[in-house]
Amino acid sequence: MSKVYDWFEERLEIQAIADDITSKYVPPHVNIFYCLGGITLTCFLVQVATGFAMTFYYRPTVTDAFASVQYIMTEANFGWLIRSVHRWSASMMVLMMILHVFRVYLTGGFKKPRELTWVTGVVLAVLTASFGVTGYSLPRDQIGYWAVKIVTGVPEAIPVIGSPLVELLRGSASVGQSTLTRFYSLHTFVLPLLTAVFMLMHFPMIRKQGISGPL
């Protein structure tokens, strides 16, 4: 086993990487509230895992979506548990994200030289809210349908571009198959990809600049 480790160590300098990670200075004022961002990340990873599992059974069509969710909850092995964990972790992710934003704001984590860290964090917060909106519509039940109809209808009040914007969001004049397809694509591909990109920007900046000072 040591020979295998030595082989990788010689080429990748694993020990140097491990030392850099474990030897990072942690200020004495850091408390449990500084863990909120990490908890949000953990919830996101749970979302990815449970969401991926449900894609094996979910069918994104207006005729089959609700039935496929019912199948997940009643027929698929541990489907009820996977979907329940997905819903619980979604709520937890939103809550932790809100608390994390408040903690960063109250401790001045948005000030120089951490402006870009704050900007990427705000973008991640918007993406998190977008996950909630798009995911809410996927079961195609009454709550999801009317929620999407209301949310996508809000831009209609904007002069000139309101109606075209609503049609762009829905894919048609009314909420239907095109809307479900759009929201499913956003929820399972576009938003996760954008979230991963901004996380890859967010975390190295935190690593480089360190944790902000006390309140």
From Swiss-Prot:
Listed CDD domains: Cytochrome_b_N
Residues the record lists as binding heme c: C35
Annotated membrane topology: Multi-pass membrane protein
Binding site for heme b 1: H100, H202
Gene Ontology annotations for the cellular component aspect, listed alphabetically: chloroplast thylakoid membrane
InterPro entries registered for this protein in UniProt: Cyt_b/b6_N, Cyt_B6_PetB, Cytb/b6-like_sf, Cytochrome_b_N_euk/bac, Di-haem_cyt_TM
This protein's record includes keyword Manganese: no
Subcellular location: Plastid, Chloroplast thylakoid membrane
Pfam families, sorted: Cytochrome_B
Membrane-crossing residue ranges in chain numbering: 32-52, 90-110, 116-136, 186-206
GO biological process, one term: respiratory electron transport chain
Organism superkingdom: Eukaryota
Record's cofactor remark: Binds 2 heme b groups non-covalently with two histidine residues as axial ligands. Binds one heme group covalently by a single cysteine link with no axial amino acid ligand. This heme was named heme ci.
Keywords assigned by UniProt, alphabetized: Chloroplast, Electron transport, Heme, Iron, Membrane, Metal-binding, Photosynthesis, Plastid, Thylakoid, Transmembrane, Transmembrane helix, Transport
NCBIfam families xref list: PRK03735.1
Biological role: Component of the cytochrome b6-f complex, which mediates electron transfer between photosystem II (PSII) and photosystem I (PSI), cyclic electron flow around PSI, and state transitions.
Miscellaneous information on this protein: Heme 1 (or BH or b566) is high-potential and absorbs at about 566 nm, and heme 2 (or BL or b562) is low-potential and absorbs at about 562 nm.
Protein name per UniProt: Cytochrome b6
Species the sequence originates in: Daucus carota (Wild carrot)
Taxonomic placement: Eukaryota, Viridiplantae, Streptophyta, Embryophyta, Tracheophyta
